Amino acid sequence: MHLRFIFIIISFLFSFTIKANELEAHPIFAGGYQEAVFSVSDIEAQVKFYTEVAGWEILSEGNVSQRIITAYSLPKNTTAREVVMGNSGTKRGFIRLIEFVDVDQVQIRSSAQSWDTGGIFDVNFRVLSMQKKFKEMQEYDWQSASDPVEFSFGPFVVKEWLPRGPDGIVFAMIERVQPPLEGWPHLREMSRLFNATQVVADIEEAKDFYIDKLGFKLYLEHKGASSKEGPNVLGLPHNLTTKIDREVYILHPTGVNEGSVEILSFDGAVGRDFSALAVPPNLGILMLRFPVYDIDDIHQLSIEKNIEVIFPPMKVGLEPYGEIDLMAVKGPGGVWLEFYENND
């Protein structure tokens, strides 16, 4: 369960709604996002980090297909290397690291505050030992607006931290303190990705995109400010945590917290908008990739729902999946989403 809706609530005396529903197959999506794509400036350093600190392994590596380079409207002579990494034993929640060569780049969310909008704010991991990861990641120059925060949430005691690392990439890391975490047998250092967050300027527009257009279902909803002033991982001034409302929806094709998308808005905190920068080859959390049953169905749905199609379906090799049909759309806050059908 992703706990962003209580990041700045030290007490559990707040109201929230979790949408409980029977899991029903989505007619188009085969699940939540399969992978997040990171555009990085030093791929070797990042492979070392995910191997040594996250305890992940390399699943595939090679050059980015020229068909994808062309679809991204990059110069014809552009080349890029990619490495796909994952938590050993898991079948989803991967990270695809891409290093574009000799291109002009800026960070998508450079020096961003948590309330700045546009692009993808963070991706979420579980960890076994927050203190261990806190120390290790500081040694790799990851920093944050706060140290890890421990708090109670109903029957749970958790620790949470939002570190920022190279290329402006932000993690949301969660350790379950009590009761012991169950159902994560492959968690040794850092788990697979299970959620990604967008901070949006217009929460209704974002809900319309994911719920009304793509047919995602609600996993969790929360509205309100903190019940007490104090420390928080979002970097809000302690005296304003009770004055700034947050509105949060966690959404997924079948309403679970596995490859889900979280949309978050702030009422009373306004910052910069990075929507125009959330495009290749810029640096940071570049996009999410979702598996679909039929690429033609999602393409047709995009047209019917007036979703901006960045490029239409095309056949391309994409390891470790093999031959796929791939397309891309633009979502709220300029977010780049790709959908693929596996043909193998």
Language-model regions: role of each:
Residues 23-24, 28, 55, 59-99, ...:
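Post-signal peptide N-terminal segment of secreted/secretory-pathway proteins
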Residues 1-5:
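Positively charged n-region of N-terminal signal peptides that target proteins for export
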Residues 21-28, 38, 59-62, 83, ...:
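Vicinal oxygen chelate
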